[in-house]
């Protein structure tokens, strides 16, 4: 399914854009005075006609085209393992430093007498 976004084709987005623009135009024309207020009917009917034309004359066929067998190739194979090795080394170094800091934490002597 080439040319799809979120599983739907471009026609759905064209229809959504058409109806959003028509609704905004109708909202603006409702505030108009005089004869411009009645042009909302023509805008709405025009949108209905364009929608009917777009729905009745689809571009693609009903049967999907046979898909060619895809070969999966991992192009970033070496880089992924270099990154994994680097992150492992950083993790082990950090763990070593934390344990050393924990083991070598200074313990201060308490004074026997306080005057």
Swiss-Prot record:
May be involved in ciliary biogenesis or function. It is a multi-pass membrane protein. It comes from Bos taurus. The keyword Cytoplasm does not apply. PANTHER family: TRANSMEMBRANE PROTEIN 218. It is found in: Membrane; Cell projection, Cilium. InterPro entries: Tmem218. Keywords: Cell projection, Membrane, Transmembrane, Transmembrane helix. The keyword Hydrolase does not apply. GO terms for cellular component: cilium; membrane. The gene is TMEM218. This is Transmembrane protein 218. The lineage of its organism: Eukaryota, Metazoa, Chordata, Craniata, Vertebrata. The chain crosses the membrane at residues 10-30, 38-58, 81-101.
């Amino acid at each position: 399914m080439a040319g799809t976004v979120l599983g739907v084709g471009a026609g759905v987005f064209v229809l959504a854009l058409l109806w959003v623009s028509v609704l905004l135009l109708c909202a603006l024309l409702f505030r108009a005075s005089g004869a411009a207020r009645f042009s909302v009917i023509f805008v709405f009917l025009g949108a209905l006609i364009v929608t009917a034309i777009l729905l009745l004359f689809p571009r693609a066929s009903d049967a999907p085209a046979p898909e060619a067998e895809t070969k999966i190739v991992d192009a970033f194979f070496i880089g992924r393992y270099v990154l994994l090795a680097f992150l492992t080394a950083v993790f082990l170094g950090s763990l070593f430093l934390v344990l050393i800091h924990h083991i070598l934490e200074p313990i201060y002597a308490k004074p026997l007498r306080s005057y």
